[in-house]
Design a protein with these regions (language model features):
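Conserved ABC transporter NBD signature motif
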Residues: 790-799, 810, 838-846, 941-943
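A short, proline-enriched helix->beta-strand linker immediately N-terminal to the Walker B motif
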Residues: 877-881
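Catalytic Walker B motif of ABC-type/P-loop ATPase nucleotide-binding domains
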Residues: 883-887
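Helix-to-loop junction immediately C-terminal to a conserved catalytic motif
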Residues: 782
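Transmembrane alpha-helices and adjacent helix-loop boundaries
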Residues: 40-43, 90-134, 149-156, 202, ...
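ABC ATPase NBD coupling module
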Residues: 798-819, 855-856, 948-954
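The feature captures the beta-strand-to-loop junction immediately N-terminal to the Walker
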Residues: 767-769
C-alpha cells in the first residue's frame, strides 16, 4: 500500500506539469487551430531564465518566478503570435507542423546562446548545463514531511500541487464566468463567425497565446527541481502531455487538465508494477511514449474526409510542359560543375563537407517521398537511418561486402517503415506526426539498446567501399560517386511522380475520397509511401555512416530527425532537387558561420530552426518560391489583354429591340431603377410579366408568421422596430454598396466588376446558379474576403479596407450559409455574444418561448429551424443596419422557411437593409423589393421585383432559354 501511495503522489507531481502544458496546448490550438510543438521549448526557456535570475543574478525566487510567469512568458507568446502564429494559421498543416518544430529547435539554442554571450560579457550568469537538483520556488534545500511509513512529500511537490489547483480554479472561472472566456470558447467553435459578431479573433488569439505561454512558463519554473536544465527532457514532457490534450479533443480545458493528472499517475503505476518488463532495457523510460502512442490510437477520431480536398494543394508548376533542358538544365550543369570542382578547386576539407552534404541529401530526399508526395509528416526518419546503419555495420563486421550490407540495411529500414506505418496510418496531420515521434523515441529507448545491435557505446565500423580502381576513401571520389547517386535518385523520384503510381499518390494526398472512388487504395498507397521513404532514408543513412566510417546508436536520435525535417521543408519538400540544396546547406552552413560569424555551436541550430519561420510566407519553401517569383515578374512584364465577357444567360429581362448600345452605360445597381448589364453594356428594357399582388393599403403582403416563431408585435422588441423607412430621405447614402468589385481566392477571380446597392428598409435578392459567385459576394460585403479591385461602402463611407470585425461594428451582419450559431455554446451563451444586457435576452425569450425553455441546451442539439431562429432572434432585438443572409432557407422545411421570411420582412420594416442570397427564386421573390441576377461572377441584370419574368427566370436556372 505504501508503494502505491508513493507512486500516486509522485505521479501527481508530473501529472500536474502535464496538466499545465496540456491546458496551454488546448488554449493555443483552440484560438488558432495550431498545435504548438514548441510548447515544451517555451517551458525550457522560461526555466532557464528563472534559473539565471535566481541562481545567477541572485534574485529572490518568488519575484523571479512572478516576472517569468506573468511578464516574460506572456510577452513571448504575444510576440510569437504576431510574428508567426497568425500567419501560420492560414497555411497548410504540414507547414504549421514544421514551423513549430523549427521553433522547438531554435528556442532552447537561442536561450543558451544568450547565456554564452552574457557570460563572455562578464555578466554574473551560471553555465546552463544539464544540472539536476536545482532550487525551485520554495525553500532550498526543499523541506520534507513524512505522511506515513515510507511515504513523504517535499516543499517543491506541495507547491506544485497547490499552484496547479489554483490555476485550475482560475481557468474554470475565466472560461465559464467571464465574457473573455465566452469569446474564447466561441472562437473554438467558429473563428470566422466570431469575427462576424464584431469580436476580433486576432485579439483572442493573442490572449490565448499569452495565457498558454504563461502556463508553459509556470510549468517550466515548477519543473526546474525535477528536470533540471535539460531541453531534451522538457521536449519529452511536452510530447507526453500531448496525450492529455488528445483526451480533451484539443478543445476541452477541463478534460485536458484531468487527463494530465491521470496521465502522470498512470505512467508511474505502469513503470512501478510492470514487473514482466524488468528484463527489457529502457522499458521504464519508454513508458510515457507507449502511453502517448496508445492514447493517440485510441482517442483520436478518424476525421470525415468525403468531399474534402487538401488545404496545402501543390503550387502551380510554372515549368509544366517545358523541355528537359529548361526543367533540368540548371541542375545538370550544377552537378557537372560540382564534380569538376572536387578535383580542381576544393580543398580536402571542403571536399569532405560537400560529400557530407550530398550524403545527407539522400536522407533528406526521403522527406520528399513521405511529405512531398504523401503530405504525411514522419518524425521517425532518424530511426530508419539508425536502424539501417546499425544493421549494415553488424553485417559488415561479420564479413559481408559493403553492397550486400547496404542492400540488407535498406530493406530493414523499409520493413521498419512499414511496421511504423501500419498502426499509424489511421491517423493524420499532427496526430500522425506525434505517433511517429513516439515510435521513434521507443526505438531510441528500447530497440537501439539491444546489446547485439548497438555493440556498446563504440558502435560499428563502416569502412568506405572500394570498387576496382575507385577507392571511395578519397573524399573527392566519394563526392563524385554521391553526385551520381543523388542524380539517379532524383531522376527516379521525378519519374515516380509522373508515373501512374505517382499520380495515385498525388490523388490520395489531394482528395482521398475521390481517389477511392477512382479505384485507388488509400491504405496501400500510404503504406507504399511510408515504406519507400523509410527505405530511402535507410539507404542514405548507410551512405552517411560510410562517410563518417562509424555508426553508434546515438548518432541520429529522434531529436536529430526534427532538425532534419525543419531544414528540408524550409528549402522545399515537394521536389528532390530542393532536398539536395537543403543537404548542402545543412553541411556547409555551420562551417561558414564558424569561420565568418561565431564559433558558437548554437547559432547554426538557431538558424536551422528559424528557417521554419519563412514557411509562414512561403509554405512551399524558399527554393520553390524562386520560380514563383520569377513567373510573377515575367507576367508583370506582359501587358494584360481585355478579359473575355461571357454570354449573358437567358433571363426574364428583354433587351431593347433597337439593340443600340449605350455609349455610357450606368452601372448595374439595386436602387430600383432599370440598369445596364455591367457584363455586356447593353441597355435592357425591364417589363412586368407577373407582378406581385398588393393589398388594399398598397403594401406588399408578407408570408404568414407562424405562432412558434412569435408574433411580429408581441413581447418587447428592439429599438426602432416600429419604424418603416421604406422610402429613405432623398440624398441619404445607401446602407451598403459594392462598386466594381473584383475578388477571388488564391489568385483565381470569382467576381468581375460587381455593382450592387441595397438601401435601408429594402430587400435585395441576389439570384443565380451554383458557382455564380453569390456566396463570394456575401463574403466580400461582410469583410471576410478582401477585394482585388473596386470599393465597398457602408452608409456612404469607404469600408473597403475594413475587415469583418470593423464591418460588424459598423452594423453589417452576415448570417452565413448553414447556421450562424456556435454549436457547443448554449442558447443563453449564443445570445450573450450579441446581446450583452440580460434584459435584452429576456425580451428574446418572451418573444420566442421555445428558446427560453431550452436556454441551457447546446445550440448544436437544436433542430435546423430552431438554430435559424436562434441566429435571427438577437437581430430582431437589436436590428443591424445591414443584414447579409446567405441561403437562409437552406435545409429547412417549407413551413419553417415561411417563418424565416416573416422575420426577415420584419427586419426590413424595422429599417434594416437586407441582402439575401437564395437559389430558391420562387420563395425569395415573394418578399424581395429588388432582384439582381449573378452569372459567372457578373451582375447580368438588376431591377425592381415587379419587372421580373418568373417563367423566363426558371428557364435561365435550368438552362432552357432559347
Amino acid at each position: 500500500m505504501g508503494d502505491l501511495l508513493v507512486f500516486v503522489l509522485s505521479g501527481l507531481v508530473s501529472g500536474a506539469l502535464y496538466a499545465l502544458l496540456a491546458t496551454g496546448l488546448v488554449l493555443s490550438y483552440s484560438a488558432s487551430g495550431l498545435f504548438n510543438f514548441a510548447h515544451g521549448a517555451t517551458a525550457y526557456l522560461c526555466a532557464l531564465t528563472f534559473y539565471e535570475l535566481h541562481s545567477g543574478l541572485g534574485w529572490p525566487a518568488v519575484p523571479a518566478a512572478l516576472l517569468v510567469v506573468f511578464v516574460l512568458a506572456p510577452a513571448l507568446g504575444w510576440g510569437l503570435d504576431r510574428l508567426m502564429f497568425r500567419r501560420l494559421a492560414r497555411v497548410g498543416e504540414t507547414a504549421q507542423i514544421v514551423a513549430t518544430i523549427g521553433l522547438l529547435v531554435a528556442l532552447p539554442a537561442a536561450g543558451l546562446w544568450v547565456v554564452e554571450l552574457l557570460e563572455d560579457a562578464g555578466a554574473p550568469v551560471k553555465p546552463a548545463e544539464n544540472q539536476f537538483g536545482l532550487p525551485g520556488v520554495g525553500p532550498s534545500p526543499a523541506k520534507s514531511w513524512q505522511l506515513a511509513d515510507g511515504v513523504g512529500i517535499d516543499s517543491d511537490q506541495l507547491i506544485t500541487w497547490v499552484v496547479t489547483a489554483v490555476v485550475a480554479v482560475a481557468l474554470w472561472v475565466l472560461l465559464r464566468h467571464t465574457r473573455l472566456g465566452l469569446q474564447l470558447r466561441a472562437a473554438v467553435d467558429n473563428r470566422s463567425l466570431t469575427e462576424l459578431r464584431g469580436i476580433s479573433a486576432d485579439r483572442l488569439s493573442s490572449v490565448a497565446w499569452m495565457i498558454a505561454s504563461g502556463l508553459a512558463g509556470l510549468a517550466g519554473v515548477l519543473a526546474t527541481p525535477l528536470l533540471g536544465l535539460s531541453a531534451h527532457d522538457f521536449t519529452l514532457f511536452l510530447f507526453v502531455s500531448a496525450t492529455a490534450a488528445v483526451i480533451g479533443r484539443f478543445a476541452s480545458v477541463p478534460l485536458a487538465f484531468a487527463g494530465g493528472l491521470g496521465l502522470g499517475v498512470l505512467q508511474n503505476l505502469v513503470a512501478g508494477y510492470a514487473s514482466f518488463a524488468e528484463s527489457i532495457t529502457g522499458f521504464r523510460t519508454a513508458v510515457p511514449f507507449l502511453i502517448l502512442f496508445g492514447g493517440l490510437l485510441v482517442l483520436t477520431r478518424r476525421a470525415r474526409t468525403a468531399g474534402v480536398a487538401a488545404v496545402d494543394a501543390p503550387p502551380v508548376d510554372h515549368l509544366a510542359g517545358a523541355s528537359w533542358g529548361r526543367r533540368w538544365g540548371v541542375w545538370a550543369v550544377g552537378a557537372g560543375l560540382l564534380c569538376v570542382a572536387f578535383y580542381t578547386v576544393t580543398t580536402p576539407f571542403w571536399s569532405g563537407l560537400l560529400a557530407q552534404g550530398l550524403a545527407i541529401a539522400l536522407v533528406f530526399m526521403s522527406f520528399t517521398v513521405v511529405t512531398g508526395l504523401g503530405a504525411m509528416v514522419s518524425l521517425a526518419q532518424g530511426t530508419f537511418v539508425t536502424g539501417a546503419a546499425l544493421v549494415a555495420g553488424l553485417l559488415m563486421s561479420r564479413g559481408w561486402p559493403f553492397v550486400a550490407a547496404l542492400a540488407v540495411g535498406t530493406c530493414v529500414a523499409a520493413l521498419l517503415g512499414a511496421l511504423v506505418a501500419l498502426p499509424a496510418l489511421r491517423l493524420g496531420g499532427r496526430t500522425l506526426a506525434l505517433a511517429t515521434l513516439a515510435l521513434a523515441f521507443l526505438a531510441d529507448q528500447v530497440l537501439f539498446q539491444l546489446r547485439w545491435l548497438r555493440n556498446g557505446d563504440s558502435g560499428w565500423s563502416i569502412p568506405r567501399p572500394v570498387f576496382g580502381p575507385v577507392d571511395l576513401s578519397d573524399d573527392r571520389a566519394l563526392g563524385v560517386a554521391l553526385v551520381i547517386l543523388v542524380a539517379l535518385v532524383a531522376a527516379g523520384l521525378s519519374a515516380l511522380r509522373d508515373s501512374p503510381s505517382g499520380r495515385a499518390m498525388l490523388a490520395v494526398r489531394s482528395a482521398p475520397a475521390a481517389a477511392v472512388a477512382s479505384g485507388v487504395s488509400v491504405l496501400r498507397t500510404k503504406l507504399l509511401l511510408f515504406t519507400l521513404s523509410a527505405g530511402l532514408a535507410g539507404f542514405g543513412g548507410v551512405m552517411y555512416a560510410s562517410y563518417n566510417t562509424r555508426i553508434t546508436a546515438t548518432d541520429f536520435t529522434a531529436m536529430t530527425g526534427l532538425v532534419w525535417l525543419a531544414v528540408v521543408v524550409a528549402a522545399g519538400v515537394r521536389r528532390p532537387q530542393y532536398a539536395v540544396v537543403a543537404g548542402l546547406v545543412f553541411a556547409l552552413a555551420p562551417r561558414v558561420l564558424a569561420d565568418y560569424v561565431t564559433e558558437s555551436a548554437h547559432l547554426p541550430v538557431i538558424l536551422f530552426g528559424l528557417a521554419g519561420l519563412a514557411l509562414a510566407n512561403d509554405p512551399d519553401g524558399y527554393c520553390a518560391a524562386v520560380p514563383v517569383r520569377l513567373a510573377k515578374r515575367r507576367a508583370a512584364l506582359v501587358p494584360a489583354g481585355p478579359s473575355p465577357t461571357p454570354p449573358l444567360p437567358e433571363t426574364g429581362l428583354r433587351p431593347d429591340p433597337s439593340g443600340a448600345p449605350d455609349p455610357d452605360p450606368p452601372p448595374a445597381t439595386a436602387g430600383g431603377t432599370p440598369s445596364a448589364s455591367n457584363a455586356g453594356g447593353a441597355e435592357f428594357a425591364l417589363r412586368a410579366n407577373q407582378p406581385r399582388q398588393a393589398d388594399d393599403t398598397g403594401q406588399d403582403p408578407a408570408p404568414p408568421a407562424f405562432e412558434e416563431w412569435g408574433s411580429p408585435h408581441d413581447g418587447v422588441l428592439g429599438e426602432g422596430l416600429g419604424r418603416s423607412p421604406r422610402s429613405p430621405a432623398g440624398g441619404a447614402p445607401p446602407a451598403l454598396e459594392l462598386r466594381g468589385v473584383t475578388a477571388g481566392y488564391d489568385g483565381g477571380l470569382v467576381l468581375h466588376g460587381v455593382d450592387l446597392v441595397v438601401r435601408a428598409g429594402e430587400i435585395l435578392a441576389v439570384l443565380g446558379p451554383n458557382g455564380a459567385g453569390k456566396s463570394t459576394a456575401c463574403r466580400v460585403a461582410a469583410g471576410l474576403l478582401p477585394v482585388e479591385n473596386g470599393t465597398v461602402h457602408v452608409q456612404g463611407r469607404d469600408a473597403t479596407r475594413d475587415g469583418a470585425v470593423l464591418r460588424s461594428r459598423a452594423g453589417v451582419v452576415l448570417a452565413p450559409e448553414g447556421r450562424g450559431i456556435f454549436p457547443s455554446l448554449t442558447i443563453e451563451e449564443n445570445l450573450a455574444l450579441y446581446l450583452k444586457e440580460a434584459d435584452a435576452r429576456a425580451a428574446v425569450y418572451d418573444r420566442f418561448p421555445r428558446l427560453g425553455e431550452r436556454r441551457g441546451v447546446p445550440a448544436g442539439a437544436l433542430s435546423g429551424g430552431e438554430q435559424q431562429m436562434l441566429a435571427l432572434a438577437p437581430l430582431l432585438q437589436l436590428p443591424p443596419r445591414v443584414l447579409i443572409a446567405d441561403e437562409p432557407s437552406l435545409g429547412l422545411a417549407p413551413r419553417i422557411v415561411d417563418g424565416v421570411y416573416a422575420l426577415l420582412t420584419e427586419l426590413r420594416d424595422a429599417g434594416t437593409a437586407l441582402l439575401l442570397v437564395e437559389e430558391k427564386a420562387a420563395e425569395i421573390l415573394g418578399i424581395a423589393d429588388t432582384v439582381a441576377y449573378l452569372s459567372q461572377g457578373r451582375v447580368s441584370w438588376c431591377g425592381p421585383r415587379a419587372e421580373v419574368e418568373e417563367d423566363r427566370l426558371t428557364e435561365a436556372y435550368l438552362g432552357m432559354g432559347t
